[in-house]
């Protein structure tokens, strides 16, 4: 559901802002809890922070429940309020209270609760004809996951599956790193075993990345329904899971570089798949 813009009947932006000073305000508590837990609220809302991310949520047509502005950043309110529907709860918070709500050490002055659009594993599997499925196993670094989400959208992936042990996609650093891709990309969180069974049932070829061993990426076959498995930074992919992989892809790089991080490796593989697809 897309957020409507203000109509002529909507109140002027300056009249929509109410001042909230109490730490125990229900929405303040809800947003603080969502940020600290890095999970959705009971109502299915995601806490986001920063001008660019809020603008991406607006552009993606997400429904906003509430938007908070830092008192010293009211100029941002004047720019953003006309883009928000009149039903959205908007408030200005004293700087100290605002800083206690958001996790960023240098907050940009705006935070919001937006309704996340859910997808199912079946939704992702139905899109395999459009692009590869990215399967993430045990990845803990939020920056890497944010990069993977951004690259998955950029290079036409069908979606991203997050297995157990993977950082929450609603972690503030993941949301920021995805640059809005989290709002538009199909992302599901399920047990890895369930995903692997489904992929086998649908004859989807499972590939994994390696820095040294495997088929060199430029020489690998990347046709047909394909899933790309990305492991964590430390332990990587377990032996049991690797035993189910159809092909290991080795990304050529200078020998003095031990390895590529998960975000870079995923991006390179996804780019190569997209490049070949566009080349016909």
Can you say where each PLM-predicted feature lies in the sequence?
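Boundary-proximal intrinsically disordered activation/regulatory segments immediately upstream
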Residues: 1-79, 166-167
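RNA substrate-binding interface of SAM-dependent RNA methyltransferases
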Residues: 4-5, 52, 59, 94, ...
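Short, aromatic/basic amphipathic alpha-helical patches
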Residues: 75-87, 241
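A glycine-rich helix N-cap at a beta->alpha junction
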Residues: 84-103
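C-terminal edge-of-domain segments
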Residues: 105, 110-114
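Structured adenosyl-cofactor binding patch, chiefly the S-adenosyl-L-methionine
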Residues: 112, 151-155, 164-181, 239-280
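Active-site/ligand-binding-proximal alpha/beta "capping" segment
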Residues: 207-257, 261
């Amino acid at each position: 559901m897309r957020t409507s813009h203000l109509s002529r009947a909507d109140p002027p932006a300056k009249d929509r802002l109410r001042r909230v000073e109490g730490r125990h305000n229900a929405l303040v508590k809800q947003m603080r809890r969502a940020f600290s837990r890095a999970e959705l609220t009971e109502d299915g809302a995601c806490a986001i922070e920063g001008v660019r991310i809020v603008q991406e949520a607006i552009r993606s047509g997400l429904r906003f429940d509430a938007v908070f502005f830092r008192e010293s950043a009211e100029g941002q309110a004047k720019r953003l309020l006309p883009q928000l529907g009149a039903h959205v709860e908007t408030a200005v918070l004293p700087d100290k209270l605002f800083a206690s709500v958001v996790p960023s050490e240098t907050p940009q002055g705006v935070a919001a609760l937006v309704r996340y659009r859910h997808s199912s594993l079946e939704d992702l599997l139905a899109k395999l004809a459009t692009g590869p499925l990215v399967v993430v196993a045990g990845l803990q670094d939020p920056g890497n996951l944010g990069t993977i989400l951004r690259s998955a959208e950029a290079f036409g992936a069908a979606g991203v599956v997050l297995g157990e042990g993977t950082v929450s996609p609603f972690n503030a650093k993941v949301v920021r790193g995805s640059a809005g891709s989290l709002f538009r990309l199909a992302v599901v969180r399920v047990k890895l075993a369930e995903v692997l069974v489904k992929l086998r049932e649908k004859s989807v070829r499972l590939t994994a990345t390696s820095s040294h061993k495997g088929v060199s990426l430029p020489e690998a076959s990347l046709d047909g329904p394909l899933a790309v498995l990305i492991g964590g930074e430390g332990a990587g992919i377990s032996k049991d899971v690797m035993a189910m992989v159809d092909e290991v892809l080795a990304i050529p790089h200078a020998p003095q570089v031990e390895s590529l991080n998960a975000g870079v490796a995923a991006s390179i593989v996804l780019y190569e798949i997209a490049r070949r697809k566009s080349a016909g």
